[in-house]
Amino acid sequence: MHNLIIGETCLLSYQLRRLNITEGKNELFDNMLATIDGVYDLIDDNFNNILNEEYLEFINYMYYPDHNISHPKWINKKYSLDKDNIFSWPVFSFFHYDAFNQDQKDSIIRKTSRFKSKLEDKENVNLFYYYREGKNYNLSKIFEKCNNFKKFISEKYDKNFNIILITKDAGNKNLLYKKIDNIHYFNFTSPYSWVGIDDNWDGHCDNDLFDIFKTEYEKIICNID
């Protein structure tokens, strides 16, 4: 069983590695920003345009508009998608990469090839997606997108894919698990923000909740294909 991250931020990369749910070499989306809309279209295109220079642009992206904070980053315009206006960061960003540095470009190519091979082989796959909170947050729409994505990718590669959706609300610490339709859904509640400008970008203030998440995840993983 492969465990792969498909977005939206590198928070999951930190936490899933800390919990030993993912291990080994970094995968394609571990250090990128992407929406499920962009990932869907990228896979539908068989990854062919991920580094197509026609779509690459170096921009000063406004990551925290409320604080007037921006960062210069490479993006792929073709996959910077928000088809229903529900994402806080509608961008496909090579966040920790310089897409025109040859060594880093080669790294992206290797990661793309490795990621694609795991989709294509015979092992089933767990796909982890963190839906980042924001003013356009729409839980029903993200469930619809996740279900559509699961159907699409399972049919494309003719094997089973499980979607593990993670969201975060403000409040007293709690972790809720539900299976809704075909999606394994974990909702974290905590007084600590995961989207602020402080250093809690990796959710480390809620490591205790992620430890509980691992226990619950291991229970359900025994019962899914």
What residue ranges belong to the model's regions?
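Extracellular glycan-modifying ectodomains
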Residues: 1-225
